[in-house]
């Protein structure tokens, strides 16, 4: 197998599930079933609000249409995952993705640290810049500043989680010297993984993150992106650090061979899910994943 970057976090492929349209009273049960099936992680989506009128183009559909109806139910991901944490023991808890520039970093740091402590160090902060200008307008934040805000927020989060005192005098994050306790179990090593497909997004993941979340790739396109990220990691002097590649796969596509193909292409994990995957498909999907994950090639 061709190794496309110096360090791989795992010696075998991992499989997670992305539960995008599941209600809270169903989420815990599905997460428990996923844990029993051998899945390593459960991921939930996040938006603060859903605008009534959306002119922004959704970047992961050719027609730019929003991925879900405007009346979709939205829940706080940290509260949802807290419920999952209380009823599971090993499955990791991720956001896919949390719109990082919309929040004060103190609020984000506290929510993430609390869940990481509650879960025994199982949180993955999947983060993105956001794609809806209307969502930022509703929150009173300039959409054009989201990348610059992210660049300031990430170092502050890591400092709050690891240092005795944190301060910041950035353009967007101004913070006098403060104490932040308790720290999450992994401190500054709590993983922050970035979504996004643009060149800027890939560089951001390599520069600031511990991983990348890819959307709707093939093994061939994954191989190309992983090679590019590997070159960026080397450019930023991070070539010897753990960096986790996760790629989204539709529930209808997942098979043992698909998992193997993505792993050989450089992905550490496939995340099975879809923005519109109906509730009725998940029992069958989880049963299928249980079979796939018991195959000799994945054990």
Q: What spans do the regions from the language model cover?
A:
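Active-site-adjacent structural elements that line small-molecule/cofactor binding pockets in enzymes
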Residues: 1-299
């Amino acid at each position: 197998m061709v190794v496309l970057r110096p360090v791989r976090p795992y010696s075998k492929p991992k499989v997670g599930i992305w539960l995008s349209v599941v209600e809270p009273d169903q989420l815990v049960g599905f997460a428990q079933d996923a844990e029993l099936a051998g899945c390593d992680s459960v991921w939930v989506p996040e938006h603060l609000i859903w605008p009534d009128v959306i002119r922004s183009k959704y970047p992961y559909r050719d027609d730019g249409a929003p991925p879900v109806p405007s009346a979709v139910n939205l829940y706080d991901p940290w509260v949802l995952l807290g419920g999952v944490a209380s009823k599971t023991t090993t499955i990791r808890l991720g956001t896919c993705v949390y719109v990082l520039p919309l929040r004060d970093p103190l609020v984000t740091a506290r929510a993430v640290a609390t869940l990481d402590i509650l879960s025994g160090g199982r949180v993955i902060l999947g983060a993105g810049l956001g794609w809806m200008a209307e969502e930022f307008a509703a929150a009173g934040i300039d959409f054009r500043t989201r990348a610059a805000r992210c660049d300031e927020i990430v170092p502050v989060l890591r400092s709050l989680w690891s240092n005795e005192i944190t301060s910041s005098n950035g353009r967007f994050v101004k913070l006098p010297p403060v104490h932040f306790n308790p720290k999450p179990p992994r401190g500054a090593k709590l993983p922050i993984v970035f979504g996004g497909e643009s060149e800027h997004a890939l560089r951001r993941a390599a520069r600031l993150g511990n991983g990348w979340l890819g959307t709707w790739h093939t093994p061939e396109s994954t191989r190309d992106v992983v090679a590019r990220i590997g070159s960026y990691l080397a450019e930023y002097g991070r070539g010897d650090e753990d960096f986790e590649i996760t790629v989204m796969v539709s529930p209808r596509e997942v098979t043992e061979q698909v998992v193997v193909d993505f792993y050989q292409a450089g992905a550490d994990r496939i995340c099975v899910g879809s923005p519109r995957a109906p509730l009725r498909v998940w029992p069958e999907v989880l049963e299928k994943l249980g079979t796939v994950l018991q195959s000799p090639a994945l054990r």
